[in-house]
Amino acid sequence: MSNKIQAIRGMNDLLPEQSPVWQYFERQIQHLMQRYGYNEIRTPILEQTALFKRSIGEVTDIVEKEMYTFEDRNGDSLTLRPEGTASCVRAALENGLLYNQTQRLWYQGPMFRHERPQKGRYRQFHQVGVEAYGMLGPDIDFEMILLSARLWDALGLMPHVRLELNSLGSSEARAAYRDALVAYFEAHAEVLDEDSRRRLTSNPLRILDSKNPDMAEMLEAAPRLMDHLDDESRAHFEQLTAMLDAAGIDYVINPRLVRGLDYYSRTVFEWTTQALGSQGTVCAGGRYDGLVEQLGGKPTPGVGFAMGVERLILLLETLDLVPEAARSRPDVYLTAMGDTASREAMLLGEHLRDALPEMHLQVHCGGGSFKSQIKKADKSGARIALMLGDDEIASGSVGIKFLREDREQESVAREALAARLQALLAED
């Protein structure tokens, strides 16, 4: 039996061949957030369990079944964060970020849920979250959707995703709708599965999220939340859809879109795709105007969304939308034959990095034959191998070998090498 220690199920290593694609995605995010005036916030991965029970809701699947919760040595109940919004609100309140001011914040990092691992979904997964506080109108909801749409454009994903919208209304409207929904489900109790019967008393709106095909027809005929909206929420939603129409952003109103977290109110939205099978949501969010007060602050409107990084990278790779330039590999691999050449190669490498800061250069270490070094240069993916040996040192030159083209080798004077490489790398 092997005594190797392996990664925990559902918690994966991000290997060197994968990380350049993540870095490409993260660069797109950082650039976009700067353009829209959002500031990054970083919160701990561990929080008091009470934070999530109070915000997400004690009778949600996340709190009941999925959280990683334990007691520390002081007997305090701690939880690995299952999502980022509650932590963001907690940090903003604790540090006075919401006092008489608006805030636009974003974050990225690992989240943890004890779910069944499946394609693109893991127990440790990464999210990018975007949150805005202190703005009550539909214009900030619109900005959230515009921001996410601009990201899809930048990544080439816009033709492959669909925006779904709904409004959950005010808490009073939801209470009235809840009563109508419970009455309807009780009248169709024989169709409900065991999970839905349990939710009937705790969280009946979540029954609408069921994927049970035996319940599909009954759910399709269920009362619609849109028919129970208060006037203010209806006006808010109509203004939002008018803005989307004016911007030319297509959307579908999905009356069964309720979101899995208790803190949402009014606008909720999801971006979905058909390209990843049945688990098609890649980004989701909405308003949570009561959450700040729920966590001990003054009444403060909030809206935000989160996207799963693993899901989006899987989507990019499935659709072959990762630019070749995003897959990191050296432009140039510098080989060195002999001890003197090895020392000289290190110094030459530093000189070239100073002269050509955008060039990716890898210097061979560890010796070996000329053949083995060229083989490693080729395997690295570099376009060009530089060759430095005793003869080149004596003549003050460097050999250039083209690894991806059928071209004659060149010999270039050391002082002209940077200029020659710059010209070669500029070629298509």
UniProtKB/Swiss-Prot annotation:
Transmembrane annotation, as ranges:
none
Q: Which UniProt keywords apply?
A: Aminoacyl-tRNA synthetase, ATP-binding, Cytoplasm, Ligase, Nucleotide-binding, Protein biosynthesis
| Catalysed reactions, as listed in the record | tRNA(His) + L-histidine + ATP = L-histidyl-tRNA(His) + AMP + diphosphate + H(+)
Instruction: Fetch the SUPFAM superfamilies from UniProt.
Output: Class II aaRS ABD-related, Class II aaRS and biotin synthetases
Q: Name one GO cellular component term.
A: cytoplasm
Tell me where in or outside the cell this protein is found.
Cytoplasm
In Gene Ontology terms, what is a biological process of this protein?
Answer: histidyl-tRNA aminoacylation
Q: What is its EC number?
A: 6.1.1.21
**Name by which UniProt lists this protein:** Histidine--tRNA ligase
What organism is listed for this UniProt entry? Answer: Chromohalobacter salexigens (strain ATCC BAA-138 / DSM 3043 / CIP 106854 / NCIMB 13768 / 1H11)
Gene of this entry: hisS
